[in-house]
Amino acid sequence: MKIVVAKNIGFCFGVERAIRTVEELLDEGKKVVTDGEIVHNKQVMEKLTKKGLKVSSEITDGEVFVVRAHGIPKDRLEELKRIFPEVVDLTCPIVSQLFKTAQRYAKERKVIVFGKEDHPEMVALKGYAPAIVTKVPFKLEEKKVVFLSQTTSSLEEYKEFVVTMIRMNEFEEAVFLNTICPVTVNREREVEELSRICELSIVVGGRHSSNTGKLFRIASKHSKTIWIESPDELPADVVKYGTVCVFSGTSTPNSLIENVVRKLKEMEGKRDGTI
């Protein structure tokens, strides 16, 4: 079995910054709280909560409140600053830029965002601009619009959405901006290319991770594909495949990917009788 590990794996810079900051605050002995997953990864969150991070939607006290990488609505941020002695905003810089862009364009035209309405990033965005968030093309009366995208969306799916919207409507002015994170785009392209040469693609990442789901869908077009959160989820028949490719979402730590590769090698060794 040949194991091919993608070059673009592990944390993106926004996730890495968020986790590093939370760990530093906890190491300082501060009571750190937040209202949801810092990142969409089960193992990472278990590690942080064991170190002392408190996660609850109804938190009202603590020394430090940390804003997740996905961001939160503007009004909520101001409210938290009145409640907590210290608020650390760990919103990904690329996500913050999306919020600012939506806010700016909302002054002159309708903002349409390609994304999942219930995703934390999109919930936060609506706190900055009165945007329509959807992945389904629709008819619209407004004549001046701007198209934006959730930062973890598929670029190709976003383009298809915009083209369909323009065909369905009679816009006088339509601005199209690529607000997708370049890190996720690079991973998307690598998965598109590598999965074509694989008999089996393994996508490692949290079940709630939007960008991991995107990579799974892309790989599934070209090869047998499985989505796992841990090495324990690897199926016994994985050893029957000649070429296995390993990909990861941006909230998946390198250590988890290394454990998956180690498990694959152990399974192959047992099949061959070498261990």
Curated annotation (Swiss-Prot):
Residues the record lists as binding (2E)-4-hydroxy-3-methylbut-2-enyl diphosphate: 40, 70, 119, 151, 209-211, 251
Catalytic activity: isopentenyl diphosphate + 2 oxidized [2Fe-2S]-[ferredoxin] + H2O = (2E)-4-hydroxy-3-methylbut-2-enyl diphosphate + 2 reduced [2Fe-2S]-[ferredoxin] + 2 H(+); dimethylallyl diphosphate + 2 oxidized [2Fe-2S]-[ferredoxin] + H2O = (2E)-4-hydroxy-3-methylbut-2-enyl diphosphate + 2 reduced [2Fe-2S]-[ferredoxin] + 2 H(+)
Pathway, per record: Isoprenoid biosynthesis; dimethylallyl diphosphate biosynthesis; dimethylallyl diphosphate from (2E)-4-hydroxy-3-methylbutenyl diphosphate: step 1/1; Isoprenoid biosynthesis; isopentenyl diphosphate biosynthesis via DXP pathway; isopentenyl diphosphate from 1-deoxy-D-xylulose 5-phosphate: step 6/6
Chain sites annotated for binding [4Fe-4S] cluster: 12, 92, 181
Protein name, per record: 4-hydroxy-3-methylbut-2-enyl diphosphate reductase
Record-linked InterPro entries: LytB/IspH (IPR003451)
GO molecular function: 4 iron, 4 sulfur cluster binding; 4-hydroxy-3-methylbut-2-enyl diphosphate reductase activity; metal ion binding
Protein's job: Catalyzes the conversion of 1-hydroxy-2-methyl-2-(E)-butenyl 4-diphosphate (HMBPP) into a mixture of isopentenyl diphosphate (IPP) and dimethylallyl diphosphate (DMAPP). Acts in the terminal step of the DOXP/MEP pathway for isoprenoid precursor biosynthesis.
Species: Thermotoga petrophila (strain ATCC BAA-488 / DSM 13995 / JCM 10881 / RKU-1)
EC number per UniProt: 1.17.7.4
